[in-house]
Amino acid sequence: MIGKSYIFHLFLFLLILPDSIYSQDNICLIPQVESMVRKKGTLSIERLESIHFPDEWKNTGNLLVSDLKELANLSVMVNASNPSIHVKKVKMQEPEMYMLEITKQGIIIEAGDQTGMIHAFSTLLQLILGSEGKELPRLIIHDKPRFSYRGVMIDCSRHFWTIEQLKKYTKQLAFFKLNTLHLHLTDN
């Protein structure tokens, strides 16, 4: 009797398992965000044609726009009158904190400082690359770093790196929201 009950429960578990796997959120962000609320619907990436930054963030914003072009092959016009991506400087509770909202009309990014804006763009880039350039899910993300020091060390004294390799690696660190690069240059 125990054998039949065991087989029945195993069969039931295997029957239900695929539904639970496919029903999970398939949005993968590194590092995991503090909170994400999914909404019904999507935003077509083709609608992302323009962006607006606060004036004091224009230089950093232009670098982020070039990253959109380079990594996601997405060209956007900067500081248009009716932007589809709107970056706002707002007062936040903590440094590097941001809010990213994807609506049917466009994207709203709120950050208290430029670092928060950079982290929001890293999240947006991960969403765009994960969507294979088609549709972004409607959602609201609130995020901030859990640790103030997030970094890696490269031992350049034993394993040599070219300047170009270090520049590429530094861009990857920013993409994953790391803020410290320790270069170990000599042993003495």
Regions found by a protein language model. Give the residues of each.
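The substrate-binding groove and active-site-proximal loops of carbohydrate-active enzymes
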Residues: 111, 150-163
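Alpha-helical scaffold elements within enzyme catalytic domains, especially in hydrolases
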Residues: 67, 172-175
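Acidic, contiguous N-terminal accessory segments
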Residues: 12-13, 20-150
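Catalytic alpha/beta active-site cores
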Residues: 150, 170, 182-184
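Aromatic-lined carbohydrate-binding/catalytic grooves of carbohydrate-active enzymes
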Residues: 176-188
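Bacterial N-terminal signal peptides that target proteins for export
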Residues: 1-9
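Short, acidic/polar
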Residues: 161-173
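Solvent-exposed loop/turn segments at secondary-structure junctions
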Residues: 114-116, 159, 187-188
